[in-house]
Amino acid sequence: MKRRFGRREFCIKSKSATFAVVYMADNTTKTTITPLEAAFIREHSGEDASKLLFRYSKESMEGFDVAFCVLQIESRNRLRAKLPCFAACEEFVFPPSINSSQTSGELSAQYKSSLLKGGETMVDLTCGLGVDAFFFAQKASRVCCCEKQDWLCKIAESNFKALKVDNCEFVSAACEDYLAQMEPCEVIYIDPSRRDENLARVYAVEDCSPNVVELQEQLLCKAPRVIIKLSPMSDLKSLCRDLQKVSDIHVVSVENECKEVLVELKRDYIGQLTFHAVNITKTNTDILSFNQETDETACEFVSSKEQIGRFIYEPNASLMKIGRFGRLVEKYDFKKLHPHSHLFTSDVPIEHFCGRSFEVEEIRKPNAKALKDIKKANIVVRNFPQSVKELRQQTKIKEGGEDYLFFTTLCGEEKVCLLCKRI
């Protein structure tokens, strides 16, 4: 259904209350929230946005814009978990269209700010909503925020005033144009758009806009250090091939879900590339670092089920993406089930493992007859010919519960099902 308020049109999917907000030709939008609007937003916080819009669509609301307020309520409902500091600020204005999939969450933005030494001068060439710039500003001495959309730049500047950030300046310009004429700084940060001209997702670094492969020399001329944020789907081998002077690649996961890949370029860097597997939780940040030469040579494999230890370990999403598991074996001294299974085992429990840990209760054959007594379990497939969906159809096991079933293949090509409990 559609509802019009002045020059704006809201398209609402009533089931999910998700907005696709289309601004008319003038592309004007509000940059501040009035006290009356703040009171309305506070009063209706957490309510269903589509119902609110329907309820107030026919009422004359003096002193504030109902559609704007509903947009703010919907944005806060949707992004409160990802951006708690911003959602909690009553004066913070969420723009009418925000690519929440590309916008950094606060936890990953805090990690990026930790990469700064402190006191640097910095330019964020793709400011957007300003999440990363906000956290960079807490470490850098000065941050220049460049945003090509003038209306979004004005919103970000107003929001930073509301957040009481006073060491940022804002420039409305295409990042390529600003890069050409900007003064040198110590660090440049860039998060190229991962949408093409038809708004379809792209993942290859050369398909993003701007194309940092083409800009990398110019970037390093303006700053000795460049940090590039890319898709979690980025191919790491391609990045190493297409980008020069790469010193570090950070694969960043939040709660074991891969969120982004950060590539660091350094102007005068000569040496081995270092990978950082990062998994951030609300209480802890696990980081395992290793150089490009680390490989599988140190791995010992399990050839039969009798060699499976009491415990099974599944590396976190960042480690799984990087894929160099020799460093894990070196650190934890355990065996791998198969070169392609990416599961590890030991007889001794490992504290603070960078991933999930399980205790093996039984080893069974991977068929319906051997599993007929199990009614509910979490099924995990690693290097196994059948999918989770196929196994559920075959075994009639429902999703959930405390049990985990790992369907996998050992180094001797024996297929097994490991009945485990998470520890």
Which residues does each predicted region cover?
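SAM-dependent transferase fold signal centered on methyltransferase-like domains
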Residues: 2-423
